[in-house]
Amino acid sequence: MRVFVILPAAGLGTRMAAGSHTPHQPKQFLELEGVPVLIHTLRAFAAVPAVSAMIVAVRPNEIERVQAQVNEYGFQDKVRVVAGGDSRQQSVSRALATVECDASDIVLVHDAVRPLIEPAVIARTIEAVEKSGAAIVGLPAVDTIKQVERTAAGAIITATIPREYIVQAQTPQGFRCELLRRAFAEAEADGFTGTDEASLVERAGAQVTVVPGSPSNMKITQPGDLELAAFYLRQRSSR
């Protein structure tokens, strides 16, 4: 069994730029405690012995820049940089097309801008995929969740969803390679776009299990997220 990791990193980071006074650059290039966010993410997966290779999908005009970072931090033997697409789904699909896998192999998909994923959680996700064929990291809901209907007057609550039925999906999301390929092929044939890989796999009829996540496995999206991530990182270093 081999484990391949796909890191979609072709986003523009428009939400981060909207609230920032600094010159705009994609989130994966921002520095967290002096090291690019993407490099923190690569380090976490490189620390897991089961991981065979990582594929980073970036915008075509950023391939050279990312490859230079990969080389600078010594990941060139384990990381490939490929051209992504205009959406997350396109980027993952293009990266997946470069993976030569067999029936026993596993593919993990992880947001490049979740730099604080812990190697132990990655390992547990791999174990869960070995058992069930599909698993994601999820964080149990702590707030009361309301279902709403959008109207001209604003959002109207239509139901309260019990928290025990809710998890906030995180990454990595892992699948047997052939299952993920089939899910992407069916989605493309039907013109379906999902917000994550699990939604495509669910649609293909497979059951997806959940591995407990952590609040520190945050996605850097908004201004202020870098400061919070730095706090988590310093806290982890002081253990």
From Swiss-Prot:
InterPro entries registered for this protein in UniProt: IspD (IPR001228), IspD/TarI (IPR034683), IspD/TarI_cytidylyltransf_bact (IPR050088), ISPD_synthase_CS (IPR018294), Nucleotide-diphossugar_trans (IPR029044)
Protein's GO biological process: isopentenyl diphosphate biosynthetic process, methylerythritol 4-phosphate pathway
Domain of life: Bacteria
Site positions for Transition state stabilizer: R15, K27
Pathway: Isoprenoid biosynthesis; isopentenyl diphosphate biosynthesis via DXP pathway; isopentenyl diphosphate from 1-deoxy-D-xylulose 5-phosphate: step 2/6
GO molecular-function terms, A-Z: 2-C-methyl-D-erythritol 4-phosphate cytidylyltransferase activity
Key words of the record: Isoprene biosynthesis, Nucleotidyltransferase, Transferase
EC number: 2.7.7.60
Pfam families membership: IspD
Family label: Belongs to the IspD/TarI cytidylyltransferase family. IspD subfamily.
Role, per record: Catalyzes the formation of 4-diphosphocytidyl-2-C-methyl-D-erythritol from CTP and 2-C-methyl-D-erythritol 4-phosphate (MEP).
Xref: PANTHER family: 2-C-METHYL-D-ERYTHRITOL 4-PHOSPHATE CYTIDYLYLTRANSFERASE, CHLOROPLASTIC (PTHR32125:SF4)
Descriptive protein name: 2-C-methyl-D-erythritol 4-phosphate cytidylyltransferase
Protein encoded by which gene: ispD
